[in-house]
A protein has these predicted regions:
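Bacterial N-terminal signal peptides that target proteins for export
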Residues: 1-7
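C-terminal motif of bacterial Sec signal peptides marking the signal peptidase cleavage site
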Residues: 14-19
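Bacterial lipoprotein signal-peptidase II cleavage site
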Residues: 21-31
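Short, glycine-/small- and polar/acidic-enriched structural segments
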Residues: 37-198, 202, 211, 215, ...
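Second-shell loop/turn segments in exported
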Residues: 46-47, 134, 166-168, 207-211, ...
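Solvent-exposed, polar/charged alpha-helical surfaces in well-ordered, non-transmembrane soluble domains
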Residues: 59, 126, 161, 176-180, ...
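Periplasmic-binding protein-like
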Residues: 140-150, 229-261, 268-272
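Secondary-structure end/capping motifs
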Residues: 260-312
Length: 312
């Protein structure tokens, strides 16, 4: 399955779920309801923080500007005019990862009051519920695309049952909650997990297949085979979801205290349907927004790379 088809499938599942869950009076009240929906109640700019560099996995959010806008290479903030509705607003989509010290979305929502929505995963929401509670308002992806990828010439893993016996090191980001689950269930040994991953391909390339590494099914397998010349060959992977760790990945969330504000609720009543429509529009015609995402990555000029062929 191509990268584009896989991403579209993941996004489609999320949109079907959103449609099925949006028809009751109780749900309408929680989101502000059609009667209270007011885009003019939204802040200007509308700030949304992601958890990584610009990429198509956030296509529905970048689509809010219809492909218009530019990125600040220093801050990683992409800014452009809202292309939906009749209320003039600027949209600011902030890159995550190294631009924010690899902080999770929950932490960013509490450290910067200007941020309206941030990307969070279910596992981090549960873990941080006491100290940094969040409420998800839109599931952008239904099937968690997180993976552990590996060199098929080194390891012939067919399922998670093969990983522990191999003794392979799993290079992950620090604070990846699924690693605690993998250890607790005996799928891997604690000493196999190395939480020093910084998002760069350098370590995986240098180890020449000796280690496994976290990634996204919709991103790294293509990049390593086609865009990262130091590797330049296929990788295989196991989905984290197939280990039994089933979460919503990259849901857009807000601080619960902000939901007590009637204006914020009215804003969300208008903005969430726009986010849904933008996601549909991105799947139907991703070209302009993908071009903007690709240009943003070029302008950032970092270790993270995308190609025109890859982003399609």
């Amino acid at each position: 399955m191509s990268r584009t088809r896989l991403l579209a499938l993941l996004l489609t599942f999320a949109l079907v779920l959103a449609a099925c869950a949006s028809g009751t009076d109780e749900d309408d009240a929680a989101a502000g309801g059609d009667g209270g929906a007011d885009l003019a109640a939204c802040p200007d700019p509308i700030v949304i923080t992601t958890d990584w560099f610009p990429e198509s996995e956030y296509g529905g959010v970048y689509q809010l500007t219809g492909g218009e806008g530019s990125i600040d290479p220093e801050s990683g903030a992409f800014t452009g005019p809202l292309a939906y509705g009749d209320v003039p607003r600027q949209v600011e989509v902030r890159a995550g990862g190294p631009f924010v010290g690899f902080q999770p979305g929950s932490a960013l929502l509490y450290s910067d009051d200007d941020i309206l929505l941030g990307f969070v995963n279910t596992d981090s929401q549960i873990t941080l519920a006491d100290s940094q509670p969040t409420v998800a308002v839109f599931a952008t992806i239904e099937v968690n695309p997180q993976i552990i990828m590996f060199d098929p010439e080194t390891y012939d893993w067919e399922s998670w049952d093969d990983v522990r016996e191999s003794g392979a090191v799993l290079l992950t980001f620090g604070g990846a909650f699924y690693t605690d689950y993998l250890i607790a269930t005996g799928l891997v040994d604690a000493e196999q997990v190395d939480p020093s991953y910084d998002g760069s391909p350098a370590r995986f390339n240098a180890e020449n297949g000796a280690i496994a590494q976290q990634g996204f099914a919709t991103q790294e397998p293509y990049n390593y085979e086609n865009d990262f010349e130091d590797w330049g060959r296929p990788v295989d992977y196991l989905l984290i979801q197939d280990s039994g760790w089933e979460i919503y990945s990259q849901a857009l969330a807000i601080r619960p205290d902000k939901l007590e504000d009637e204006g914020v609720r009215s804003c969300l009543g208008a903005l969430v349907p726009i986010l849904q429509q933008a996601s549909v529009d991105f799947m139907e015609d991703p070209g302009p927004t993908n071009a903007a995402i690709l240009q943003a990555v070029i302008d950032l000029d970092s270790f993270w790379v995308l190609s025109e062929a890859g982003i399609e």
